[in-house]
């Protein structure tokens, strides 16, 4: 019984630590992982003519100079 209670308490502590990271910070980390540059919303140079759209990089056509 003590083991179950201890496991529940540890699980609750781990969950509260995960939730402590602000959403914006988490999105910035995810944005960096996918190669987007946050100041101009373009992907890094190695990915070619692509820009950030939501959570992914998409092809940048000749008519678009910046991702919306």
Curated annotation (Swiss-Prot):
Propeptide positions: 21-34
Xref: Pfam families: Toxin_7 (PF05980)
UniProt entry tagged with the keyword ATP-binding: no
This protein's UniProt keywords: Disulfide bond, Knottin, Neurotoxin, Secreted, Signal, Toxin
Protein name according to UniProt: U2-agatoxin-Ao1u
Function: Insect active toxin causing rapid but reversible paralysis in crickets. No activity shown in mammals. Does not show effect on mammalian voltage-gated calcium channels.
Localization of this protein: Secreted
Organism: Agelena orientalis (Funnel-web spider)
Annotated tissue distribution: Expressed by the venom gland.
Signal sequence, renumbered to the chain: 1-20
Swiss-Prot/TrEMBL domain comment: The presence of a 'disulfide through disulfide knot' structurally defines this protein as a knottin.
Gene Ontology molecular-function annotations: toxin activity
Family affiliation: Belongs to the neurotoxin 01 (U2-agtx) family.
GO cellular component terms given for this protein: extracellular region
Keyword Secreted included in the entry's annotation: yes
SUPFAM superfamilies on file: omega toxin-like (SSF57059)
Disulfide bridge positions per record: 36-52, 43-57, 51-67
Source taxonomy: Eukaryota, Metazoa, Ecdysozoa, Arthropoda, Chelicerata
């Amino acid at each position: 019984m003590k083991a179950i209670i201890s496991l529940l308490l540890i699980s609750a502590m781990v969950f509260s630590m995960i939730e402590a990271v602000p959403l914006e910070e988490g999105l910035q980390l995810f944005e960096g992982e996918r190669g987007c540059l946050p100041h101009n919303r373009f992907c890094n140079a190695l990915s070619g003519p692509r820009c950030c759209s939501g959570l992914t990089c998409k092809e940048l056509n000749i008519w678009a100079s910046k991702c919306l």
